[in-house]
Swiss-Prot record:
The modification Phosphothreonine is found at residues 1671, 1762, 1764. Changing residue 512 to E: In DDVIBA; uncertain significance. The gene is TCF20. This is Transcription factor 20. One of its GO terms (biological process) is regulation of transcription by RNA polymerase II. It comes from Homo sapiens.
Length: 1960
């Protein structure tokens, strides 16, 4: 983000307007935050970067910047307007034309359109990115051309905004063409500065677009006219897109890609359909074949045919190189949009070098914009950067590597923007940019990269792509042969050289220059990764696939893709959701950037081009869902065509798209299958093809798939997924996204992903059905088939994912994920799914894919990730690995798919605001998993794929290398990724926000790690630990299947463990650790700012969750100051998200890697220990570099592969310890991966960052907010976990169980050490890991022990929570390493995945709380907290912990759920101890945690708090969880009762039953049980049973906790909030709730009921102790003497009376609300008289009461002064009635502040009650004293206002303050004692101020005769000392500073009461 920010800064204007574009929708939600964040970061540029990168949130800020920029460039206004347009949606884009109507503005609107649309879609992820990037002007023109790409707007635009953007662009294009020409010329003339500044996006876009537009309009007059015609469609599309995600992006992108989109739309439209098809096919082909694209582009430019694009691209590349500095952005755009570039190349270079709108437009236009659009779209996305980068590819990439670095970064940014745009929609692209909110990362990354930000973007992208670049580089170097082989054969043309060059040179270049890396990694990730990787993976296939998909998909998908990208699922599948995502989401969806940005990102990167293609391909075929299936096939078909084949195929399919969507889809499917066969060799092919396609498709698929929900999803996802991986990415993503996402994620995630990617969604369905069905059978063919076939991919990928476990896990997990995520993202489920998922994956891929097969896929992934957020960087890491692995093998692919799914999910989580939170949690979890998968996969699978699935050592080395170097080079790249990524992702990820940071960073490593960890957590989140790497790899293993698993484990043992562990540790450290978490945190913050909470990118989705999250995020925003803190927050937030994601992912991961992964993991652990070591060392050192917290931990990375896991585990182990899961996980995991994985999500922040960061965050961030955030995140994570686990619990957990046991064995081997490690979390973590390293033998030994009997044993133990807890404790203590580990593993596996995450989250919260409470303040404490608290936890958990847990749970629930500061604080206080209990108790308390999680999560924004608890309860049913997940999506719901009432209850219940918590953990375990078959039901039952018991204990807890944590009571009281009405009547029934309403900016109005009815009743029934009531004092009250004075009871309001009087206070004679004294409480009747009153108050009274209650509550809350006052008062009065003291004390806190004080007695509380219960809103004075008000100050005048009401002569009304300050008045059990006496005395007392009778306050000074009414005392300026309710007249007032001298204070109570008594 910083990078982006800087980029943003660089492109402030550009980014600015993108922000605006973005801001409108998602950015509107995001924008404020993002704008703030980005503005914070980029200032104007930051805003711009915000716009681009953080377009979502920053967009608005960027809008401001854009406004500034707008002035800078007319276009910027357009941008701003456009931003709003893009933000406002597609239609706005069209409107924007007018809006942007400034001469430059219309041009800018889409030149601006491209730039603005682009730029705004920088906002649109593409345009702005392009604007940001190279020269958005040129490339935004190209963006316009690439609009198609960039937008998969063309995708989106195709469906919604195929023309949407184009239409806009058309209309806009015409306007803009003229204006854009002006603008472009203008901008182009001022191109460098302007484009870079405002003009870069604008200029580039404007310039290009005029060129494009003029060209397109003139050249492609038909097309452009079509575009214009389509512009109408654009508006339709806009509407559609508006509905869908498309609207923002298409608009943004439409403008940006209007030429293209026009063309594209034309593509979508019939005219361009054919034309675009041809062109696009070529363009896409070119894009697909990066070689082709330049040619195609060039030719297109020249011949306006796809070939021209290639040449053009080549030309462009040179030109880009020529223009690099000038066009660095532009060329980045060029690179980003090869078509754009090509056009830019020609446009820029030869023909109109960017200045000739005609030329450029012609270039686009000739291609009919579809082609260039496709080309551009794909080129930018997949081909643009890769096209330029790949085509001239290497030229461009290399060239871009140098200049294009910025250019390429821009391209990457643009591409990701493109990708996101397509993915999201063009608009989502905008959103990708905005969503780049997530887009912030991706787009700002891309965008910011534009000019100078190019560097930043490059850095950001580099950070995002560093892994990619490093991966790419390493991969290029290591995999260069593979890449070249894969790429070259596949992309024999330029893809070969480009890919190789790009892969080799460019990655190196990129590595050389962060920018280059970013460009290559980011851009290249987008282009290189997408194109290059696709090509590398797919060979040219990727390119061709991309092209094909871009062309065909983009074309066909142009509409659908646009819709898809706009999230046709959103539109189609979930138009509402998508619209939610799209409308608000597409633009906002980026906000909700879950799916959107994901797609955005994905789309942005390759998704744009690939998805543009895929989307388009899919759009043609994917327009229909059936078509989508075809499209997936089509998407994958190009891959199967083979690189060249696909290239030509792309050309063909591109022409096909109109009708070839299905054909394409089928071809893709066929080719995919065939090509997939080639696929692995041409894995990149398949992946690249599908990857490209997938990438394109996701862009498109999101559009297309969104449009054609299923098929497109499958296609899009697979394309995105398959394409994403560019086969690894595309494959994994295609597979993973398509399959994994479809399968694992989509099942869980289909809705979300489908909606997000529609392709994804499509695939989720497929995943659900097909994946599951074809799953096993296709496992073998999955690699070949799945990858090639997106649809098949889904199925095959499922098969590949193969492992049924994985598949099932994916299915189970993902299905729930999908639905859940979808639900989570329900607001913008698709958006969530697609964008985030897509993005994280692409990003991840981009990060990792650069490494390997994933590189192409990675491109996608990365692109997605990039777009999604910089998080996608992490995501890319994750994704790439997954994709690479996925690419490598079916299993790998499956794993990768799973990963992708998780990534998708994660991405989903990432981008979707609230949805994002969910999705992000998922997505991030998924991303981590996916990243892990992808990294693992990429590392293992990719290398395996390329090297052979079984070449693990090489693979490992490669993978390690690549994982390390490329994906983060496992360790290196992880670190590199994190180091740079951290550095950059910090900016980058910050851009996207937490999602970004987390996803990007963690997404990269952490994400992957988290994914793994989450998966580990999720499924045996633990079980993944031992092979934490194996497990981490397990998913990968599953990806790689056995061989790959072996490989995977081998690589991932080293890589998995080092990568997963170290990587994850690193990632963790990063993900949760500083850079990532920081990024995430910061990014999240920024995102949160614009996205609400990155944590809950649901901001986006849900306001409530947003509020909470926003609060949390705002909290985190504070820490955002420090990257680490941010990371910590991110970790806290992200971990939760990640955890949730991870949990979600966990099962799939566990599932896949369960079977083979365990063995492989073990073997790998043993065999790969050294590689792991090396990697771990790398990781360790890098981690150390990256994260401070991880330093000590990271020192051990080299120690062992286990240690890495342990390091990671340590990292999060200590946090986990804090979490209890961490402990369990750490203990359990020795399976470093598992713990790491599990912890990454949860404890990464805990340990690495968490320890430090959390601590710091807590310090920096408000403890409560941190807690809450942690809790929210955790809860979300837990919920996700629960959901995912539940969904995948059965299948995945079974696999996981086995795997978990294996893992456990492995982990257990490490566990004792890890326990030690945990004990010595920071330093020893590594040491333990070293031991763990040593424990490979141990691992093998332990596995049988733990692996074998562990399941049942663990189940039993889990069932018997004490065992688990104790085991966990022992484990933590290293006492029962095996048993404990088993228990821990199972508990953590079950619990941590479900509750574990929650536990971790709770622990996190606890940690935060503890740290805040300074219980866990010290890192050692945290770590020790894990160790100590864990053992202590076990014991405490059962004993005091039970209460503490209850309290903690309650507090946590309250904190997360209610999040009342008090509750949080109380929770914090409680939590530390409780947490200590919880870390271990986390296992036991997992269920409670889960429930708190669920409940908290609901508040957190996990919609299905209850659902989750239910899901956890009903863990036996995946469906149950799935529904729960679906329930979850309504995160918005969370604020409601669940958060308060149910969550607490459930949490407390479960917490109370620490043992029940294990059952909740059992949901994860249930899958294990499921594996066993029987245990699961038992667990469920037990869990439910436990929950039930928990419910009972909860009450006890409430009682016990009542004193400890009052916040709990409010929830309890909430039940009675409405009861007072009826009860006020009867003495016993007269319950006066004292409600304290505090307006929390974070939470909104927080209502705290101070006194529960029970309390009152118990007091009345003295037999009962009042302890039940909140305060123990009631019991004391009972035991102690009550006031001897008579008491009054509140009675019904008199509705009929012969006496009419003024309703005034009986003490002061003033009316209600007099001087802000609040409402009057009453009516109170003398006890004798009250008995005569009717028991049932008249209805009027009830209404009055209600109204009064409302008013009073406010008054009370506002007026509630200090508890101390009341406490003092109570203490003072306790003499008279001690029991009252406590009661009033609680009420006292609610005492009205206005009153400044109240009667000294507790009556203050009572008045509140009175007011609440009785409440005539009219002024109240005692009946008998109606005249008092008249004489009161202002009496006559005011008195006139006092209504005359029928009053009873015996009814008394009082002000809270008057009663509080009156002497001897007490409120006990609803009875007001002493009022009559006080009144009698007062009647004789004359006020010294107003001279009226009724004075109740006397000066405290002896001998002073001044008496006052309470209000008069205030008026007289008396000193009212609330501590003892003493009054000092003005004469005796002490000096101002000292209200009451200490002496007086001491005597105040006694003296005061004495004095008062005397007075009385």
């Amino acid at each position: 983000m910083q990078s982006f920010r800087e980029q943003s800064s660089y492109h402030g204007n550009q980014q600015s307007y993108p922000q605006e574009v973005h801001g409108s929708s998602r950015l509107e939600e995001f924008s404020p935050r993002q704008a703030q964040m980005f503005q914070n970061f980029g200032g104007t540029g930051g805003s711009s970067g915000s716009s681009g990168s953080g377009s979502g949130g920053g967009r608005r800020g960027a809008a401001a910047a854009a406004a500034a920029m707008a002035s800078e460039t007319s276009g910027h206004q357009g941008y701003q307007g456009f931003r709003k347009e893009a933000g406002d949606f597609y239609y706005m884009a069209g409107n924007k034309d007018p809006v942007t109507t400034g001469t430059p503005q219309p041009p800018q609107r889409r030149p601006s359109g491209p730039v603005q649309s682009y730029g705004p879609p920088q906002g649109s992820s593409f345009g702005n990115q392009y604007g940001s990037e190279g020269h958005v002007g040129q490339f935004q023109a190209q963006h316009s051309g690439l609009g198609g790409v960039s937008h998969y707007q063309q995708d989106y635009t195709g469906p919604f905004s195929p023309g949407s953007a184009q239409y806009q662009q058309q209309a806009s294009s015409q306007q803009q063409q003229q204006q854009v020409q002006q603008l472009r010329q203008q901008l182009y003339q001022s191109h460098q500065p302007l484009p870079q500044a405002t003009g870069q996006p604008a200029s580039s876009s404007s310039h290009l677009q005029p060129m494009q537009r003029p060209s397109t309009l003139p050249s492609s007059a038909a097309g452009y006219q079509l575009r214009v015609g389509q512009f109408g469609q654009h508006y339709q599309s806009s509407a559609s897109s508006s509905s869908s995600s498309s609207f923002p992006s298409p608009q943004r992108f439409s403008q940006s890609g209007q030429s293209y989109d026009g063309s594209y739309n034309v593509n979508a439209g019939s005219q361009y359909e054919g034309h675009n098809v041809g062109s696009n096919a070529q363009a896409y082909g070119t894009q697909s074949n990066y070689s082709y694209q330049p040619q195609s582009m060039k030719n297109f430019e020249q011949a306006k045919i796809p070939q021209g694009t290639q040449q053009g691209q080549q030309q462009q590349q040179p030109q880009q190189q020529q223009h690099p500095s000038q066009h660095v952005m532009q060329y980045t755009n060029a690179a980003t949009k090869l078509p754009l570039q090509s056009q830019v190349g020609q446009y820029n270079q030869p023909e109109v070098p960017v200045r000739s709108p005609m030329q450029f437009h012609q270039n686009f236009s000739p291609i009919s914009n579809p082609s260039p659009a496709a080309s551009v779209v794909q080129s930018p996305s997949c081909s643009s950067t890769p096209s330029p980068l790949m085509q001239t590819g290497e030229n461009l990439q290399c060239g871009q590597g140098s200049v294009p670095m910025g250019s390429r970064n821009r391209i990457l940014q643009l591409m990701p923007q493109l990708s996101p745009t397509p993915s999201m929609m063009p608009s989502p692209n905008s959103h990708a940019a905005g969503f780049k909110g997530f887009g912030l990362e991706g787009v700002p990354e891309k965008r910011l990269t534009d000019p100078g930000l190019s560097s930043l973007s490059a850095l950001s992208t580099q950070v995002a792509n560093l892994p990619n670049t490093v991966q790419h580089m390493l991969l290029s170097d290591a995999l260069t042969p593979q890449k070249k082989t894969s790429k070259r054969p596949s992309s024999s043309k330029k893809a070969d050289s480009c890919t190789n060059s790009e892969g080799s040179s460019q990655p190196e270049e990129q590595l050389k220059s962060p920018m280059a890396e970013s460009l290559d990694g980011g851009c290249s990730s987008s282009s290189e990764d997408q194109g290059e990787r696709v090509r590398q993976l797919s060979g040219q296939s990727t390119s061709s696939d991309t092209t094909y998909k871009g062309g065909a998909s983009e074309k066909a998908g142009s509409s659908p893709a646009q819709g898809a990208q706009n999230e046709p699922p959103r539109l189609n599948a979930s138009p509402a959701a998508r619209e939610e995502a799209t409308s608000p989401g597409a633009k906002d969806m980026p906000l909700s950037s879950d799916g959107n940005p994901k797609v955005n990102e994905k789309t942005v990167g390759v998704i744009v081009s690939r998805e543009a293609m895929t989307g388009r391909v899919e759009k043609p075929g994917g327009q229909d869902k059936g078509s989508q299936e075809d499209d997936p096939a089509a998407t994958q078909r190009p891959p199967s065509n083979g690189g060249a084949k696909e290239t030509s195929h792309a050309s063909l399919p591109q022409p096909e798209p109109p009708g070839g969507g299905g054909s394409k889809g089928n071809k893709n499917g066929d080719n995919n299958s065939n090509h997939n066969g080639e696929g692995n060799g041409q894995s990149g092919h398949s992946a690249a093809g599908p990857g490209f396609t997938s990438r394109t498709e996701p862009s498109k698929s999101p559009g297309s798939l969104r449009y054609s929900y299923k098929d497109s999803f499958g296609s899009a996802v697979p394309r995105n997924v398959s394409g994403f991986p560019q086969y690894p990415t595309g494959q994994e993503k295609g597979d993973f996204t398509g399959h994994g996402e479809r399968k694992g994620r989509n099942e869980k995630f289909p809705s979300l992903l489908q909606e997000v990617l529609q392709g994804y969604h499509h695939h989720p369905d497929r995943r659900y059905s097909r994946s599951t069905q074809e799953h096993q059978g296709m496992a073998g063919s999955l690699e070949g088939t799945t990858r090639p076939n997106v649809l098949v991919s889904q199925t095959n990928e499922l098969a590949s994912r193969g492992l049924l476990n994985k598949s099932i896990g994916s299915l189970l997990e993902n299905p729930h994920w999908g639905p859940w995520e979808r639900k989570s993202s329900s607001t913008a489920p698709e958006m969530k799914q697609i964008n985030l998922t897509d993005y994280p994956i692409p990003r991840k891929f981009e990060i990792e894919p650069q490494s390997s097969a994933h590189e192409p896929g990675g491109s996608l992934s990365e692109r997605r990730s990039v777009i999604c957020d910089i998080s996608p960087l992490r995501q890319i890491v994750r994704d790439p690995g997954a994709h690479s692995l996925g690419h490598m093998s079916a299993d790998t692919r499956i794993g990768r798919n799973d990963r992708l799914n998780p990534t998708l999910s994660q991405s989903v989580i990432l981008p979707g605001g609230l949805v994002s939170m969910e999705t992000k949690l998922k997505s991030q979890s998924g991303q981590i998993k996916e990243e892990d998968f992808e990294q693992s996969k990429s590392q293992a699978s990719f290398n395996n794929k390329k090297s052979g699935d079984h070449c693990h050592p090489p693979s490992i080395k490669h993978e390690s290398y690549r994982g390390n170097a490329s994906p983060g080079a496992a360790t290196h790249d992880s670190l590199s990724d994190y180091g740079p990524q951290d550095s950059r992702p910090t900016p980058m990820r910050r851009v996207p926000g937490r999602v970004g940071g987390r996803e990007g960073m963690r997404g990269r490593s952490p994400s992957q790690y988290h994914d793994f960890a989450e998966k580990l957590k999720m499924s045996p989140g633990r079980s993944r630990g031992p092979g934490g790497d194996p497990h981490h790899m397990n998913p990968h293993m599953t990806f790689s299947e056995r061989a790959n698993r072996s490989s995977l484990h081998t690589p991932f043992s080293p890589n998995s463990e080092t990568l997963a562990s170290a990587y994850h540790a690193n990632t963790r450290a990063h993900a949760y650790g500083d850079p990532n978490a920081g990024l995430n945190s910061q990014l999240h913050y920024k995102r949160q700012m614009y996205q609400q909470q990155p944590e809950e990118y649901k901001d986006w989705s849900s306001g409530s969750a947003q509020g909470v999250i926003a609060a949390a995020q705002h909290r985190q925003e504070g820490p955002r100051k420090s990257p680490r803190q941010q990371q910590f927050l991110d970790r806290v937030r992200s971990p939760l998200k990640n955890d949730k994601d991870g949990m979600m992912y966990g099962p799939p991961v566990g599932t896949y890697h369960d079977p083979s992964a365990q063995e492989a993991g073990r073997c790998l652990m043993s065999s790969d220990g050294l590689p792991n070591k090396g990697m771990e060392l790398k990781h360790g050192s890098q981690k150390l570099q990256e994260s401070c917290w991880d330093l000590s931990r990271q020192t051990s990375p080299a120690k062992s592969s286990g240690p890495p896991g342990m390091s990671s585990q340590k990292r999060y182990g200590p946090p986990h310890e804090t979490d209890g899961h961490g402990l369990a996980e750490a203990t359990q995991s020795s399976k470093p991966g598992s713990v790491m994985l599990r912890l990454p999500g949860q404890e990464d922040h805990s340990s690495q960052n968490p320890l430090i960061m959390r601590r710091r965050v807590r310090s920096f961030i408000s403890p409560i907010p941190s807690k809450r955030q942690s809790q929210d995140v955790k809860n979300s994570s837990t919920e996700d976990k629960g959901r995912l686990l539940h969904s995948s619990k059965e299948g995945a957990d079974k696999a996981f169980n086995s795997y978990a046991h294996l893992s456990h064995s492995q982990d257990i081997k490490s566990i004792p050490k890890r326990d030690s490690s945990k004990d010595l979390p920071s330093p020893d973590s590594r040491n333990c890991p070293a031991v763990t390293l040593t424990s490979p033998a141990k691992t093998k030994i332990l596995p049988p022990r733990k692996g074998r009997g562990l399941k049942l044993e663990a189940i039993v133990q889990k069932i018997t929570s004490p065992n688990i807890r104790r085991s966990a404790s022992s484990n933590s203590a290293e006492a029962g390493g095996d048993t404990v580990t088993l228990d821990d593993i199972l508990s953590l596996k079950s619990g941590p995945p479900e509750g574990g995450s929650v536990a971790v989250q709770d622990a996190d919260i606890e940690k935060r709380k503890g740290e805040v409470a300074s219980d866990l303040v010290s890192p050692a404490n945290q770590e020790l907290h894990v160790e100590k608290p864990l053992p202590r936890s076990s014991e405490e958990w059962r004993g005091s912990v039970d209460d503490k847990v209850k309290t903690e749970t309650h507090a946590e629930t309250v904190t997360a759920g209610k999040e009342p500061p008090g509750a949080m604080t109380s929770t914090t206080s409680q939590k530390p101890g409780s947490n200590q209990g919880r870390p271990d108790g986390s296992l036991g308390g997992t269920a409670p945690l889960i429930f708190p999680d669920s409940k908290n999560v609901p508040p957190v924004g996990i919609l299905a708090p209850e659902a989750n608890p239910k899901a956890e309860e009903k863990e036996n049913d995946t469906v149950t969880i799935s529904p729960k997940q679906e329930g979850f999506p309504p995160k918005g719901y969370f604020p409601s009762g669940k958060k308060k009432g149910r969550p607490i209850g459930s949490v407390n219940k479960q917490k109370k039953q620490q043992q029940p918590p294990p059952p909740p953990p059992q949901p994860p375990q249930i899958p294990e049980g499921s594996a066993d078959g029987e245990p699961k039901p038992k667990k469920q039952r037990q869990r439910r049973e436990r929950r039930k018991p928990g419910a009972q204990p909860r009450k006890r807890k409430t009682k016990q906790a009542v004193p400890i944590v009052e916040p709990q009571e409010p929830e309890i009281k909430l039940k009675y909030a409405t009861q007072p009405l009826d009860k006020t009547d009867a003495k016993n029934k007269s319950f006066y709730p004292y409600i304290h309403v505090v307006n929390k900016c974070e939470l909104g109005a927080v209502c705290t009921i101070i006194n529960a009815e029970e309390e009152e009743q118990t007091k009345l029934v003295r037999g009962r102790k009042g302890q039940r009531s909140l305060t123990p004092p009631p019991s004391s009250t009972e035991s102690k003497a009550l006031p001897a004075s008579s008491f009054m009871l509140q009675g019904p309001v008199v509705t009929e009376s012969s006496v009419m009087g003024h309703l005034v206070c009986c003490l002061c004679g003033k009316w209600a609300s007099y001087r802000n004294m609040g409402d009057l409480f009453g009516p109170f009747y003398p006890q004798d008289y009250a008995a005569t009153l009717p028991k049932n108050p008249p209805p009027k009274r009830a209404t009055e009461m209600q109204s009064k209650v409302k008013v009073r509550h406010k008054s009370a809350s506002n007026g509630s002064k200090t508890d101390t006052e009341e406490e003092e008062e109570q203490q003072q009065q306790q003499k008279e009635q001690r029991s009252l003291a406590a009661h009033p004390r609680f009420k006292r806190r609610h005492r009205s502040e206005d009153c400044g004080g109240g009667p000294r007695s507790l009556s203050r509380g009572l008045p509140c009650k009175k007011a609440a219960t009785e409440g005539s809103s009219e002024k109240t004075v005692l009946d008998s004293k109606p005249s008092v008000p008249t004489t009161s100050e202002g009496g006559p005048e005011l008195e006139l206002q006092i209504p005359e009401l029928p009053l009873d002569s015996n009814e008394f009304w009082v002000h809270e303050g008057c009663i509080l300050w009156a002497n001897g008045i007490y409120l006990v059990c609803g009875r007001l004692y002493g009022l009559q006496e006080a009144l009698e005395i007062a009647r004789e007392m004359k006020c010294s101020h107003c001279q009226e009778a009724g004075a109740t306050l006397g000066c405290y000074n002896k001998g002073c005769s001044f008496r006052y009414h309470y209000p008069c005392a205030i008026d007289a300026d008396c000193l009212l000392h609330e501590e003892n309710f003493s009054v000092r007249c003005p004469k005796h007032k002490p000096p101002l500073p000292c209200p009451l001298p200490p002496l007086q204070n001491k005597t105040a109570k006694g003296s005061l009461s004495t004095e008062q008594s005397e007075r009385g």
